[in-house]
Amino acid sequence: MSMNPSTNSPTLASNTSKKLPHINGMYWALVVSSTTLGETAGDFISQTLDFGYGGASAVLLALFVIATILQVLFAKQHAWMYWTTLTLASIGGTTLCDWITRSLGLGYPLGSLTIFISLVATLSAWKWWTRSRDLGAALDKIGESLYWLTILTSSTFGTVLGDMLSKNELDLDGQTIGDTLFGEFVTRHGFGLGGIGFGDTASTVALLVLLAAVAVVTLKTRVSRVSCYWGGIIVTHPLGAAAGDFMTKDDGLHLGNAWATLLLVVVLAAVAVLAYRNNKSHAATLAE
C-alpha cells in the first residue's frame, strides 16, 4: 500500500462522499459562525472565567486533540464531530494567540510572523503528504491529522491577524513588558507590539469584502479550488476575531463575553439546523 494517497481529480467534489461536509454557502456560514464563537468563547474562558491564556489554551488544546483523534478514527462522516472539532480549534486558536502575543510578549507583528511561518509549515506538510491538489486525498489518518493541525494553525494566525488589524496597542492585561518572556527582547530589537488600529467595525467590513473576493475568485476563475478553500479558511478566522471583538467590546455592541458567546451558540445551532435540512434536501434531490 502506498504511503501517500493519490487522486485523479483536483477538485473538492470527492469530499462530499467522504468525511468533509459538502462545501457550499452553508458550510462557509457555519465556518464564520464557528470562528466568531471561537473569539468570544476563548475570551470568556480565559478572561471572564479567569483561566488565564496559558491555562485556557492547555485545556482547549487537550479537548481539541481528543476531538481530532475521534474525528480521525471515525470511519464515516459525522457532521457534529467535524463542527465540534472545528469550533474547538477556533476557541483554542483564540486563547493560543493571546498567550503568544500577550503572555509571551511577542506582540502582534512578530507574533503574526511566527504563527504565519507555522501555518506555511503545516500547510506544506499536508500538501507534501497528500501529493495532490485534491483535499479529499488528505483523508487518510496522517493526512487528516495534518488537515486539523492546519485548521488549528490557521485559527491562531487568523486571530492574531484580526487583532493586529483592529487594535492599536497590545493589552498586556495588567502585566508590564518585563513580566513577559520575550517582551523586553522584542522591544529592545525594534519590533513593535501593537497593531494597525483600524478598529473592529472597519476590520470586520474589510475582511467581509476580502472573503467575498475569495468567493468571486473561486467561482469565476480557474484558480485551484483547494487553494481558494484554504484562502477562505484563513480569511474567516480574522473575520471571526474582528466580528467577535465588535460584539463584545465597548466600541462595538458591548454585549460582553458571556452574552455574546450565548448568542453565538444559538446562531451556530440555527445555522447548523439549516445546513442539515439543506444537505438532506440536496441528498434527496440527487436520489431522485
Regions picked out by a protein language model, each given a short descriptive name:
Residues 2-288:
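Polytopic alpha-helical membrane proteins, predominantly small-molecule transporters/carriers
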